[in-house]
Amino acid sequence: MADDEGEEDPGINNMGNLLQVISSESEEEDEMELEDAKTADSESPNIINFDTSLPTSHAYLGVDMEEFHGRTLHDDDSCQQIPVLPHVQVMLIPGQTLPLHLSRPQEVSMVRGLIQRDRTFAVLAYSDGLQREAHFGTTAEIYAYREEHEFGIETVKVKAIGRQRFQVLETRTQADGIQVARVQILPERVLPCPMTSLQLDSQSRHLLFPTNKPVSGRSPQSKCQWLHKYRRRKFLGASLTSWPSWLYALYDADSLMERVKLQLHEWDENLRDDSLPANPIDFSYRVAACLPIDDALRIQLLQIGNAIQRLRCELDIMSKCTSLCCKHCPDTEITTKNEIFSLSLCGPMAAYVNPHGYVHETLTVYKAFNLSLVGRPSTENSWFPGFAWTIAQCRVCGSHMGWKFTAVRKDLSPQKFWGLTRSALQPRIPEPDEGEMGHDHSPILCL
């Protein structure tokens, strides 16, 4: 990712400008500003008047992009030959939007050919930057396209969306240099409700689920009350088995979705339930795309073949994760889960691309710690219109962590926030008690 490759070219860590050299006085001012951010008023803004639809539109790519309609879906378990974009180092989740800015002649030629066919390419999932072979991936379908010619250089800007998971069978390189993968499309296994075989006609009237589901914005207490009533009615047949009803609820999609939503509201109190997918499969993928976890955990979520197990793993991650630390120095805490909030319709984290073609999955948080700022604020190619960005680095190891965004207008809320790149973060769980700490204890989450 860009945080590793940025050491070779400092210009690729920003959103468009070359890294600006500033005086030591400016650096001291930035340090003072950061200290103020840690000790200032800790209250988060109650009202966000920023248009959250702007980041999802990716307007920085241009407004006159050619849009395509329809979608391409391959049959489950079918084998397909799909071209691969080799330099896209993003672990794409189905349903996740992927913006691209391609300038290599081979990639430009490949995208042109895709536009004439099914507009589908493969994004391989690498668990780390040193892995040479990928075993899983996701198909991506282009839904918006723009071609540019400037100074004799041809570039294409693309908006794509993840569609289906696949397992890589083999890869080969064609005579024109384009890599093609032979993949098997992985199906989504829909598990039946365990109560289906226990439903008796005489009890059918008791199986009507409560319809007064709490709307978005209601208190957690009302949601818990609804969930309790839902479980009591849906798992009425559990009395005929040797297993308690709460055990069936652990594998019920609707119950898991409500529990995940409660966790999401702890991460983002402004989240609206009606903005989330109602389908368990789509919902599980939306949550997976928003979790600030490393690639090792994300690829495990990508391998799971049913929504229920995926939701259970996501719930485990969210309940254990309390803070995020620097990936290169894990003892350095960067932010906590209470600081996460959504400034986009996609949720607290989404993928964005800079003019150099590097894709950053950026997590928005109110406050961050142990960071130093480099350069001066700039609004050029800002992913959040109305905000100026400043490069942020880890104060301990100096690795690129993301950006600080400051509002250019006083009437814009929030006035400032941080955008942290997922590739530089590592989730961490609290240290256990001294008596429970074993020799192999690690604060890093694992499934």
Swiss-Prot record:
Q: What is its main location?
A: cytoplasm
Q: What GO cellular component is one of the record's annotations?
A: Cul4A-RING E3 ubiquitin ligase complex
Keyword terms: Cytoplasm, Metal-binding, Nucleus, Ubl conjugation pathway, Zinc
The residues the record assigns to binding Zn(2+) are: C326, C329, C394, C397
Q: Which residues cross the membrane?
A: none
Q: Where is this region: Disordered?
A: 1-47
**Regions annotated as coiled coil:** none
Cytoplasm as a keyword of this entry, yes or no, is yes
Residue positions annotated to bind (S)-thalidomide are: W383, W389
Q: In what ranges is there compositional bias, type Acidic residues?
A: 1-10, 25-34
InterPro entries documented for this protein? CULT, Lon_prtase_N, Lon_prtase_N_sf, PUA-like_sf, Yippee/Mis18/Cereblon
> Where found, per UniProt?
Cytoplasm; Nucleus
Similarity field: Belongs to the CRBN family.
Function recorded in the entry: Substrate recognition component of a DCX (DDB1-CUL4-X-box) E3 protein ligase complex that mediates the ubiquitination and subsequent proteasomal degradation of target proteins, such as MEIS2. Normal degradation of key regulatory proteins is required for normal limb outgrowth and expression of the fibroblast growth factor FGF8. Maintains presynaptic glutamate release and consequently cognitive functions, such as memory and learning, by negatively regulating large-conductance calcium-activated potassium (BK) channels in excitatory neurons.
What protein name applies here?
A: Protein cereblon
Q: Which organism is this protein's natural source?
A: Xenopus tropicalis
Q: Which gene encodes it?
A: crbn
